[in-house]
């Protein structure tokens, strides 16, 4: 379907019968066709796989040198190769990057298998550059993983408590007699 036919289909039938409208559509249809082609060509430049005249900009962005005699296809393949060579983010790489912001390298990254997340523990005394730490984490972490950033204490905690366990067995109604206590057994254990 040509652009003229497409534009005519949008109009009510009584307008398409007017001579002035037909002439107007004949004059504007080629202009709209050129505009649509320009828009599609421009959007093609946003993606390496479809770019033509925009390959030069992609090469500049990714710092890929252009060699003489390269076809567009070779240039595309070189750009795609450069974009896919992003090193994987390992937990050690994340730890190393976070420790750059800390006075005492204390960052510990622990993966939680099967939960699609990881924990980052940082000494509470080293939490002065929080915005940089979070930005680094957001930039380095794989997109499919979540994380929990926790402040850790640099000294061990010792919790002391006493727990008393009572294991009581009560008599059934048929076992109750005058002078008997309600409890059959009363075992008490103290855990310290």
Swiss-Prot record:
Domain of life (superkingdom): Bacteria
InterPro entries per UniProt: Phage_Mu_Gp48
Any matching Pfam family: Phage_Mu_Gp48
Family under the similarity heading: To B.subtilis XkdU.
The protein's name: Uncharacterized protein YqcA
